[in-house]
Amino acid sequence: MEEISLPLLTKMSSERTLAVQAALMQQPDKSLALLAWTLCLNVFGSGAYSKPAQISLECKHYSLTSDAPSGKEGAAFMALMAEKARLAALLPEGWSRDMTTFLSLSQEVLLSLLSFCTACSLNGVQTRECGHTSRSPLDSLETAIGFHMRDWWQPTRGNYFGALKKQQIIAALNEAGLSDAAWDAEKMKKGDAAEHAEFHMKDNRWVPGWMCAPRPQTDTTERTDNQANAA
């Protein structure tokens, strides 16, 4: 992964974070489990609290949409904002000044609010220190919710391939099982190779390996999933 530039790492891990947020939002049971687990880390771990309900949530949508190539026009962010608008319309009048207004909400609405807010708290932006790239904190969550990046993102020259070196574009085509397309790209200039890759990747499910959760070592068949879908 270290061959991927830090700016591209930031851009694509931001894109990935928004996509996982949108996917988690659609699975309230998994979102609630994540919330409970996160709270238990504090409750059953070390440390004591002198104030009730010391819970905090930080939504990173501003920085995520600033860094992600799709910005505010991406499918994931638009889905998140559509759900936010739907839920905002269900909030009781004066809710921000009086907690008891939430007592009138149905369990269904409360669950939707918990699920959405938990999803918005995700932050999977990766960093690089001393030449070592941090592991994505989204890996195990993605596996739990059956997440696939291509449900929310389409690789293009503008949002991905154009930021790669020519040999990385060729490697991506080979990784996707498109050896003939990779061979043709060898003879092209970088810009043409990026467009070439966009065209040949448009109908498959390929995702850069470094943007995916690690596959179980015992499952050799899943490791060829990209190639099988690209064939």
PLM regions with names:
Residues 197:
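Segments that shape or occlude catalytic/ligand-binding pockets
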Residues 1-190, 201, 209-231:
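C-terminal helical accessory/scaffold domains
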